[in-house]
Regions:
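Noncatalytic, beta-rich nucleic-acid-contacting surfaces in large DNA/RNA-processing enzymes
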Residues: 3-360
């Protein structure tokens, strides 16, 4: 297998990795490597769960593996795994800029620290990563890195995969982006000798993240304080609740509902939540996915078409009312990579304010 790392000078892209497509035999070997690795991690990660829960989680993993084999993306995952490892060895995190944070395979391979099953299997929606059974798609493998590790990437990939047989006339591509927070977090880790993990986040960190989000999207200090005090009364914080708040603020100008609706079960702040509700009301997965991705952004005649689609499946009135109000939604997996870095930064702000202030 051959690799080529292109550098796009003059813009934010570090450059894309191009690699020659492995032969069918090599692809099958890669798939087996990932399957064995994931099954090993599965047994260790969820041993505290009940036997029934373990079977459900195993079914979720097998569903992803089936999609991975169908889309022939095993080497995408293995290459992303090596990029994450070489970054971590150099003291820098990576940032998933696509939707890999929603993948169990990515979590088991160490590409992301976020477990997409941590809030329950009922809130895990592989359709946003892999599409539906009738319309399968590949994940978005865009990865953010610190510029310091770019020189190590080609060397690492060549040493790891140079012996893999491939078709030298066909190339696949993985986009890489230069991300400032990867560099900052690596520098903070080196200066403090500490590297936080998601298990280290507590209420102080989450409160700091919420304040940072508010501070970044509003100008008047008095308004910031009022909103911060209001939101503290609405919900308690964990990673999932902060994720919902972050998604809400990203779309704060795209609907008219107040912050009080964050605890309203009929108010959806992510595509995942809206999709789950549609499917629960017997809207087919393909149709529901189209509505939450394209329907919420549609206008005019196209919007009317989606309204008729909802009426066709006799969804409750509150869903139609919600749909009439929203014009855009983010999916959770698109927000996770960004939010993880916000939490890492907030952790340093709380525990090493002097070092953070010097770098910010």
């Amino acid at each position: 297998m051959r690799f080529r790392l292109t550098l796009n000078n003059g813009n934010s892209a570090v450059g894309d990795i191009f690699y020659t497509v492995p032969t069918t035999n090599e692809m099958q070997k890669a798939e087996k490597i990932i399957i064995d690795f994931c099954n090993e991690r599965l047994a260790a990660a969820y041993k505290a769960n009940t036997q029934e829960e373990q079977k459900t989680i195993e079914a979720c993993l097998n569903h992803e593996i089936e999609k991975m084999c169908t889309t022939e993306t095993a080497y995408y995952f293995l290459i992303a795994k090596e990029i994450a490892e070489v970054s971590q060895e150099a003291g820098y995190p990576v940032k998933t800029l696509g939707n890999l944070s929603g993948s169990i395979i990515s979590y088991f391979l160490g590409i992301t620290e976020y477990d997409p099953l941590n809030i329950g299997v009922e809130n895990y929606f592989p359709e946003f990563i892999w599409g539906t059974d009738t319309n399968i798609v590949a994940p978005n493998f865009t990865i953010g890195i610190a510029p310091q590790i770019r020189s190590f990437i080609s060397e690492r990939l060549d040493s790891k995969f140079s012996g893999v047989e491939s078709d030298n006339d066909i190339f696949k591509q993985i986009p890489l982006m230069d991300v400032k927070t990867c560099e900052m977090l690596g520098t903070l880790s080196k200066e403090t000798g500490k590297c936080p993990f998601i298990s280290d986040f507590d209420s102080a960190v989450y409160n700091r993240v919420v304040w940072n989000i508010i501070d970044g999207c509003m100008e008047e200090d008095s308004v910031k304080v009022l909103l911060y005090e209001e939101i503290k009364q609405v919900t308690s914080w964990d990673f999932h609740s902060v994720l919902r708040f972050y998604a809400y603020t990203l779309d704060s100008f795209n609907h008219t509902k107040s912050i009080q609706n964050l605890n309203n079960e009929n108010f959806f702040v992510t595509r995942d939540e809206f999709f789950k509700n549609l499917v629960c009301h017997n809207v087919p997965a393909d149709v529901a996915l189209d509505i939450v991705k394209k329907g919420v952004r549609s206008t005019g005649a196209k919007r009317e078409k989606y309204v008729k689609e909802l009426e066709k499946y006799n969804v409750p009135e509150y869903i139609k009312n919600y749909f009439s109000d929203v014009t855009h939604l983010w999916q959770s997996s698109d927000c996770v990579g960004r939010l993880l870095h916000m939490c890492y930064i907030a952790w340093y702000q709380e525990h090493f304010p002097t070092e953070y202030a010097r770098l910010s």
